[in-house]
Amino acid sequence: MLKALALGVSLSLLASLSMAQDTAEGPAKFEAVLKANAQLPAQTFLPAPMDAPAGLQMSGRFTSGTRVETPYGWANPASGIAMPFPGQPLQGMSGVRSLGEDRFLFLTDNGFGNKANSSDAMLMFNILKMDWEAGKVGIEKTIFLKDPNRVVPFPIVTEHSESRYLTGADFDPESIQPVGDNYWIGDEFGPWLIEVDAEGVVLQVVKTNPGGVDYKSPDNQFTSQPAAGAVVTGINTGRSGGYEGMAQSMDGITLYPLLEKPFFDEASGALETIGDKTVLRVLEFNVADATWSDTVRYYPLEDAGNAIGDFNIFEGTRGLIIERDNNEGDDGREKSAAFKRIYLVDLARTDENGVLEKIAYIDLMDIQDPEALAPRGSKDGVFTFPFVTIEDVDLVDATTIVVANDNNYPGSTGREAGRADDNEYILLDVADFLKAE
């Protein structure tokens, strides 16, 4: 067994700690123990495919608010990283599935954060192989998304090229599920669901319209821009508020896309709440016939300003959802990370309004590190994961989950102020948490 995983007697000393800390109200807190970690350096780049347009051999031209064609001609103020740079950064991990034998499917998001600055960021997902003992990450395979058969229902950045690779100005992929030989990807611009084959070729793009309601964000390509003075209508999904999480049923038939931000009710002019909680919609989609169910569940946020990071089902209808605040760092900066949790939910456990019960949680700002495995050290035996966007969680085995950050390269500096975050991957022992009732 790997030394990083062989905690031995030390784990038994934490047995009492791993029992739930009951609270008078709400879900119980369970302990999480660091078992292993690996890192992919922030400055990891991939070459664009040979058949991609020449302009995609460099990325980051539009991140300063204007065009910068000179390589390394502008520096990101948060991290000092100079851009644009040759190649495509391997960053922005925004969805994960464990494939077994330390192999993981990881989705990269739209690139540099929004539609306007990411037209030279290529969309991709990767199969990564972890060497937990060495703390290193191998890139087994990279799949770039493309639309050679002209399936996408709107013009794309590379519209008139032969290969028609997709970019971060076309979609913002934030969640992924393997289904058979293909993959379904949840997007935030539409929000859309996108099916691609094993080579990344788009097979279909499905709009969101459960119950006959069209879900549209401000970035939806079919959103009409009103004339001056006119009221904007038809926008009910927040910008960067689409399918940040998307779970898959154990039988592989149903997807459960989860909005990152609350649905906007045009009639009331307010974000959706039930009782005293701001809620996020959990939808149902049948992959066999590509249709939406009318069923809607609701995930209750602990704070209206929070967001979710990922959602995966691991047993029956039981699943894991990351909920986080929008802050980073644990070094005393003005807006430090404070709320980074993973909640246990069950799709079969809702109230009369369809609001999910939060059964239990772990705190990613309070991870036990009895074996001192944290690569930059822990404080008083506690390891923290103080990233603004933590967007990856999945079950690895009966007692273990994998968690990873979206490092928003080169802008996030959660681990160390002024230094671009690496892609960090951790294994957590959460045996009691996974069994919580």
Where do the model's predicted regions map?
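Sequence/structural signature of beta-propeller domains
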Residues: 21-437
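N-terminal signal peptide c-region/cleavage motif recognized by signal peptidases
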Residues: 10, 15-17
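Bacterial N-terminal signal peptides that target proteins for export
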Residues: 1-6
